[in-house]
């Protein structure tokens, strides 16, 4: 039972969990026994419709048969070589085919490693030391980005983590999202190595870029000689095969990827312009290495996933599911609210009229959102326990799943709002 496991977990894990957002489910997290398609099955034998999907990677749904088949085959042939493999070349070739900025690729093991490497690359390439990021953008759990961070950092009240030296934090400057005036002021005043941004904010709920924001970043970074980094760990291969940069028509210098490109297995990647990527060791002097970089299991799962995405049906199904549910939620909420959706992921904010940056998102009625989450969970629908995460849909969220979910959302939201 989940309650028994929670009691044991608190004795062996800090805070009882291995990633803080998992502790946001109250009174204690449920524990998952298995998952298939759009559903989770808990240790308490409850079947839940899942709109978390591992926080984004599972765009095909849980336990997709093509991914299972590919990974089983790879397991029979070994799962770690310490040498290059055919699979890593194939997956990188898929990425360079579809992602506009990706002339070369370096695989790592997480989104955190990807952004850490991208920032190091921007510093090595430009010879500058300072970074510009945006309030509420989350780029992983390393020192240079845990400053005004979103996601669980904001949920648990620590957007500035303890343990980061001032010598590090002093090299990171922050602007509000969607604020080009601030960006230009900083770029004029400081020697900025890299500007890192979530092209769609996915870690303060969902907040889309305003029309001129991404093109403006592209123009300003070129003008002032800074490296533009799109953190597409969430949006990469979610908003289409080319990610946010294709969706919005703006090509950065570097892109970080993760989540979907590993098919639900641990992965990260940095890709971008040849002259920047070639600064990485062994061709350059910006160091990166890893025992599990490009491990065959993640490579194989990623290939199988992208092969399914290339058929386009997954995008059609997942976009329709998100659109229908976002519209149903919008109709059902009676109080002031915002529903922000970009293609196949979305979030709703209660008690506010406009959400265009992190400060706006923080004004939403988070306590009421938690009550909605708890009521939905009782009715068999699992959404993120944090206001500052996103709801994701997949190719497994078919009409039957959408119709049942819409019924539950309508019932809960009309009752609570």
UniProtKB/Swiss-Prot annotation:
Source organism superkingdom: Archaea
Disulfide bonds: none
Chief place of localization: cytoplasm
One GO term describing the cellular component: cytoplasm
Record pathway: Porphyrin-containing compound metabolism; protoporphyrin-IX biosynthesis; 5-aminolevulinate from L-glutamyl-tRNA(Glu): step 2/2
E.C. designation(s): 5.4.3.8
Residue numbers of N6-(pyridoxal phosphate)lysine PTMs: 259
Family under the similarity heading: Belongs to the class-III pyridoxal-phosphate-dependent aminotransferase family. HemL subfamily.
NCBIfam families to which the protein is assigned, alphabetical: hemL, PRK00062.1
Protein's recorded name: Glutamate-1-semialdehyde 2,1-aminomutase
Species for this entry: Metallosphaera sedula (strain ATCC 51363 / DSM 5348 / JCM 9185 / NBRC 15509 / TH2)
Phylogenetic classification of the source organism: Archaea, Thermoproteota, Thermoprotei, Sulfolobales, Sulfolobaceae
